[in-house]
Amino acid sequence: EKDYRIEKYYDVYHNKILELINLKKNKKKYLAIISIHSFTPFWQNKKRDIDIGILWDNDYRLPEIFFNFFLKNHRELIIGDNKPYSGRLKNDTIYKHATMNGLSNILIEIRQDLILEKTGQEFYAKLISRPLLINKDNSALFKQSFCSSLAL
């Protein structure tokens, strides 16, 4: 079962990302890697105290845009800086595809109870898309820039 899932999903997922990165790189273009996940509202019987987590390693280009956007426009939200998890993990999607290729990146975590219903899903999809759309022509995001990883 494990080997089947690795071959059917994990390998296909990572190979497609690598294929797209290489396609763009061959044209001297660089991507920004944006990974979106959700996290449970409780961990070890404790309520998690953040709404959205911004995870990053050592490239601050995209995280800075998101932190500034939320600070300016959505002070009611509790934003975690490398919470509820660390963005400094070797061999995750960000490390493997963005950090190792010098691509700007961010991993966004949304608390699951906020996106259970369609209205929450639509709200957070629009919310997360706004800083990206505002910065779609920001050339600094689409340049290769190698930052040494802080991943352990």
Task: Locate the predicted segments by residue.
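Short, structured coil/loop segments at alpha-helix boundaries
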Residues: 1-3, 59-63, 143
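Active-site-proximal, glycine-rich beta->alpha crossover segments in alpha/beta enzymes
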Residues: 1-15
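Active-site oxyanion-binding pockets that recognize sulfate/phosphate
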Residues: 3-7, 52, 56, 118
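Short amphipathic alpha-helical segments
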Residues: 9, 13, 62, 120-124
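Catalytic cores of processing enzymes, dominated by hydrolases/peptidases
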Residues: 12-115, 150
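His/Asp/Glu-rich mid-to-C-terminal helical/loop segments that flank catalytic regions of hydrolases
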Residues: 116-152
